C-alpha cells in the first residue's frame, strides 16, 4: 500500500469483510458483480482452460495472456486511468496478465470461522480479550460442546430453564427434541451459542475502552493488596497482573489501529492471486500444483456441502450441521496453518501440505527470501577476508565486482573523455579490460562510497559505509576492527555490497554510516572497534621480545630470576657491541635484510630524557672502553659517558616489533592531529 506521503509500505493485520470484498469485486457492464470463488476446480481437463468461477477463473483474476480474453479475442490494452474494458461474451477484462499476481478473490463461508492465528497462537488474542480459558473457547469453536450457555443479553428459553429447580430429569429428554425439529436453526441462533458465531457475537459486544478501564482498576487493586503470605496465591496474583497488562496492551492496539475485534472471525475467506499459487506443467505433461490450491479446494468442497445442508435440506439434523461447520473450521485452519491443532494434514505420498503460514514464515518464506532478501540492482556478494593494510574506513573490492557495480559510471567516463562514441563501444572496451578502464574505475570509486551489509542485520552497525579500494582476487577485504559491529569473522562469512545512487543516500553514507563514525556501541556506549582474536595475537607477537641477549650475564637480575638453573660461563663470555642503531629506519632496514629478528633485542639511540638522567637507578653493569668512555647498562636503557662523565648519548633497549608498533601509533596520532587542524 502507499500512504499519503507516497511511501510504499506493507502492513499485516485484520481487515473487515467489506475490505475483502472490495479487493476482489469487479462490476461487469451488464451489472453483474464477480469476485466470489464458488467452484473447487482449476483447469478443464479437455480444453486446459481455467474453469469459470474456479480457483483460476479469468473473469475473477484476469486473463492468462495480456489483452486476450477467454474467447480468444484480442484488444489493445488501454491506459490504467481509462475505464476497464470487458469481453461481452466471457466477461474477462482486457488488461495485462500481470494482474493475476495481485488480483484477489474470496470465498463466502457458510458459517463464520475463527482465524486460527488469533485463537491458537500463544498468547491467544481472542482468549485475552474475552478473559476466558483457551480450552473453553476451543470447545466452543470446534463444536465439542453439544450444549453451550446463551450469550444473548435478552431473555431466552435456556435462561428460563435456570429459574426452575424441579423437573430436572424431564429437561434432559425434552431439550434434545429441539435438535431434530424444522425450526432448529431459529432455536439454535436464539437459545444455543456454539461455533465461531458465539465468539463473533461476544467480540462484537466488547467495549475496548471499558476493558481498558476495568483492567487498569483491577490491576491497581491487586497491587494494593500486598503479599498474601502464600507462595501459590502470590504467584497467582502475579500471573493475573501480567495477564491484565497484556489485555490492556492488546485493547490499546485495536483502538490505535482502528481494528474491530470481531474481524478476528472470518465470514469471507480471501483467495490468493493465482500467480502466487501456480500450477506448472513439467516434462512428460504432468502438472505440479501448489499445496495451497489443494487446501483451497478442500475448503470449497466442505463449504459448499454446508451451504447445501443449510439451504436445500430443511430437515437436516442439527448435529449434522454442527459437524459440517466443524469440518469447515478445520479446513480453514489447515489452509492458514497446517498442524497448529496437532497432526498435520498429508497428501497421498505422506507428505505434509505447505499451508499459508509455511509459505510466508522462515528463512525460505515469502518475506525473507523474496521480499527482504531478494537481489537488487547495483549490489554484489562475496566472502570476506582480512585486509591488514586497509584503513578503518576502507574496504577492498575485487576488480570483478567493482567493474560490474560501477559499469554505468565507467561508461559515462569513457564517453565524457571521448574514448567511446556510444554505450555499445564503451561496453566492448570494458570487456577488453584495458589499463584505461581501471584508471577510470579508480577515479569513479574515489568519490563514491559503498555499503557493506552482513545478514542478519540486527542493529544499525550491520550496515556501514566504506571507501572502496581495488584489490586482486574475488574476496572482499575488510578491516578486522569493524568485524564486531557486523558480528563477522573470517571463517567463510559472506557480505553484500551495495552502491548508493542518489545524492541523499551518498550524503547519508558519508555523514552517518562511515565505519570511522561508528566507533561506539549505540546501545551502551562502549567502544565497538576493539582488537580481537588475530589482532591480539599479532600485538603479542609484535611486542614480546627475546630478553636474553643484551644483558645475558651474571649481573642481570632478570636472568637470575627467570633462569636460576642456567649457568653463564664467565670465561667464554666477553662483551661485544650489541646492535646499535641511530634511528628506527636503520633498525627496520636491518630486519628486512634479515640481519636481526623481529624479537631480537637491540639498542636504539634516543633523545636525552631528563627522567633517565635524573634516575637514581643503579646500573647493572658498566663497561669501559680503552679511550676512557664507559657504557652504563641499566634494565631498559644504556648511557654512554665520556671520560669526564658527561652523557654522550642514550640508547633504549627495544625490538623491531616495538619500533613498528610505536611508528604506527605515532603516524595515527599525527594524522588525527592534522584532521583536527583542518577541521578548525
Curated annotation (Swiss-Prot):
InterPro entries tied to this protein: DNA-dir_RpoC_beta_prime, RNA_pol_asu, RNA_pol_N, RNA_pol_Rpb1_1, RNA_pol_Rpb1_3_sf, RNA_pol_Rpb1_clamp_domain, RNApol_RpoC1
Catalysed reaction equations from the record: RNA(n) + a ribonucleoside 5'-triphosphate = RNA(n+1) + diphosphate
GO annotation terms (biological process): DNA-templated transcription
Record: residues binding Zn(2+): 69, 71, 87, 90
Keyword field: Chloroplast, DNA-directed RNA polymerase, Magnesium, Metal-binding, Nucleotidyltransferase, Plastid, Transcription, Transferase, Zinc
Cellular compartments annotated: Plastid, Chloroplast
UniProt cofactor(s): Mg(2+); Zn(2+)
Cited Pfam families: RNA_pol_Rpb1_1, RNA_pol_Rpb1_2
GO cellular component, one term: mitochondrion
Note on cofactor: Binds 1 Mg(2+) ion per subunit.
Residues that hold Mg(2+) according to the record: 489, 491, 493
Protein family membership: Belongs to the RNA polymerase beta' chain family. RpoC1 subfamily.
Subunit text: In plastids the minimal PEP RNA polymerase catalytic core is composed of four subunits: alpha, beta, beta', and beta''. When a (nuclear-encoded) sigma factor is associated with the core the holoenzyme is formed, which can initiate transcription.
Protein's name according to its UniProt entry: DNA-directed RNA polymerase subunit beta'
Phylogenetic lineage: Eukaryota, Viridiplantae, Streptophyta, Embryophyta, Tracheophyta
Gene that encodes it: rpoC1
Amino acid at each position: 500500500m502507499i500512504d499519503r506521503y507516497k511511501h510504499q509500505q506493507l502492513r499485516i493485520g485484520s481487515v473487515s469483510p467489506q475490505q475483502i470484498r472490495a479487493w476482489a469485486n469487479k462490476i461487469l457492464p451488464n451489472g453483474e458483480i464477480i469476485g466470489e470463488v464458488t467452484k473447487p476446480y482449476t483447469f478443464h481437463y479437455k480444453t486446459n482452460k481455467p474453469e469459470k468461477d474456479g480457483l483460476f477463473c479469468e473473469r475473477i483474476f484476469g486473463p492468462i495472456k495480456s489483452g486476450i480474453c477467454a474467447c480468444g479475442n484480442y484488444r489493445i490494452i488501454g491506459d490504467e486511468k481509462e475505464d476497464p474494458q470487458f469481453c461481452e461474451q466471457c466477461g474477462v477484462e482486457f488488461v495485462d496478465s500481470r494482474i493475476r499476481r495481485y488480483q484477489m478473490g474470496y470465498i463466502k463461508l457458510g458459517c463464520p470461522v475463527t482465524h486460527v492465528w488469533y485463537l491458537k497462537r500463544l498468547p491467544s488474542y481472542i482468549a485475552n480479550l474475552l478473559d476466558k480459558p483457551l480450552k473453553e473457547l476451543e470447545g466452543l469453536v470446534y463444536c465439542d460442546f453439544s450444549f453451550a450457555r446463551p450469550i444473548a443479553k435478552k431473555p431466552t428459553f435456556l435462561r428460563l430453564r435456570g429459574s426452575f429447580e424441579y423437573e430436572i430429569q424431564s429437561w434432559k429428554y425434552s431439550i434434545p427434541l429441539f435438535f431434530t425439529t424444522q425450526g432448529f436453526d431459529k432455536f439454535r441462533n436464539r437459545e444455543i451459542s456454539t461455533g465461531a458465531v458465539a465468539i463473533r457475537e461476544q467480540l462484537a459486544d466488547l467495549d475496548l475502552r471499558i476493558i481498558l478501564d476495568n483492567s487498569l482498576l483491577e490491576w491497581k487493586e491487586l497491587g494494593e493488596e500486598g503479599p498474601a503470605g502464600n507462595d501459590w496465591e502470590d504467584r497467582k496474583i502475579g500471573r493475573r497482573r501480567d495477564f491484565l497488562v497484556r489485555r490492556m496492551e492488546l485493547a490499546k492496539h485495536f483502538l490505535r489501529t482502528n481494528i474491530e475485534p470481531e474481524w478476528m472471525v472470518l465470514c469471507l475467506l480471501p483467495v490468493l492471486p493465482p500467480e502466487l499459487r501456480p500450477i506448472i506443467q513439467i516434462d512428460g505433461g504432468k502438472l505440479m500444483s501448489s499445496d495451497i490450491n489443494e487446501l483451497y479446494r478442500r475448503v470449497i468442497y466442505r463449504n459448499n456441502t454446508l451451504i447445501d445442508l443449510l439451504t436445500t435440506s430443511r430437515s437436516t439434523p442439527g448435529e449434522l450441521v454442527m459437524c459440517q461447520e466443524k469440518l469447515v473450521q478445520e479446513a480453514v485452519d489447515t489452509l492458514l496453518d497446517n498442524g497448529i491443532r496437532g497432526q498435520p494434514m498429508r497428501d497421498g505420498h505422506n507428505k505434509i501440505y505447505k499451508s499459508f503460514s509455511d509459505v510466508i514464515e522462515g528463512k525460505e518464506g515469502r518475506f525473507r527470501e523474496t521480499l527482504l532478501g531478494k537481489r537488487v540492482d547495483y549490489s554484489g556478494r562475496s566472502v570476506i577476508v582480512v585486509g591488514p593494510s586497509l584503513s578503518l574506513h576502507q574496504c577492498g573490492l575485487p576488480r570483478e565486482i567493482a567493474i560490474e557495480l560501477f559499469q554505468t559510471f565507467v561508461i559515462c567516463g569513457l564517453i565524457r573523455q571521448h574514448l567511446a562514441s556510444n554505450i555499445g563501444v564503451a561496453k566492448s572496451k570494458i570487456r577488453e579490460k584495458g589499463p584505461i578502464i581501471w584508471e577510470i574505475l579508480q577515479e569513479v570509486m574515489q568519490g563514491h562510497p559503498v555499503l557493506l551489509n552482513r545478514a542478519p542485520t540486527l542493529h544499525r552497525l550491520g550496515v556501514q559505509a566504506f571507501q572502496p579500494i581495488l584489490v586482486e582476487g574475488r574476496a572482499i577485504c575488510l578491516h578486522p576492527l569493524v568485524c564486531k559491529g557486523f558480528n563477522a569473522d573470517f571463517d567463510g562469512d559472506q557480505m553484500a555490497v551495495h552502491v548508493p545512487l542518489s545524492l541523499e543516500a551518498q550524503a547519508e553514507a558519508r555523514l552517518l554510516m562511515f565505519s570511522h563514525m561508528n566507533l561506539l556501541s549505540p546501545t551502551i556506549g562502549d567502544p565497538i572497534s576493539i582488537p580481537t582474536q588475530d589482532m591480539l595475537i599479532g600485538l603479542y607477537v609484535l611486542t614480546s621480545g627475546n630478553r636474553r641477549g643484551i644483558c645475558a650475564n651474571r649481573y642481570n637480575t632478570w636472568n637470575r630470576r627467570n633462569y636460576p638453573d642456567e649457568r653463564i660461563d664467565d670465561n667464554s663470555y666477553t662483551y661485544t657491541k650489541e646492535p646499535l642503531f641511530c634511528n628506527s629506519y636503520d633498525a627496520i632496514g636491518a630486519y628486512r635484510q634479515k640481519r636481526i629478528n623481529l624479537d631480537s633485542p637491540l639498542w636504539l639511540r634516543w633523545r636525552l630524557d631528563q627522567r633517565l638522567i635524573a634516575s637514581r637507578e643503579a646500573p647493572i653493569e658498566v663497561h669501559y672502553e680503552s679511550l676512557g668512555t664507559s657504557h652504563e647498562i641499566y634494565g631498559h636503557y644504556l648511557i654512554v659517558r665520556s671520560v669526564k662523565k658527561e652523557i654522550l648519548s642514550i640508547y633504549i633497549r627495544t625490538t623491531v616489533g616495538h619500533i613498528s608498533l610505536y611508528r604506527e601509533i605515532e603516524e595515527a596520532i599525527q594524522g588525527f592531529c592534522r584532521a583536527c587542524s583542518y577541521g578548525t
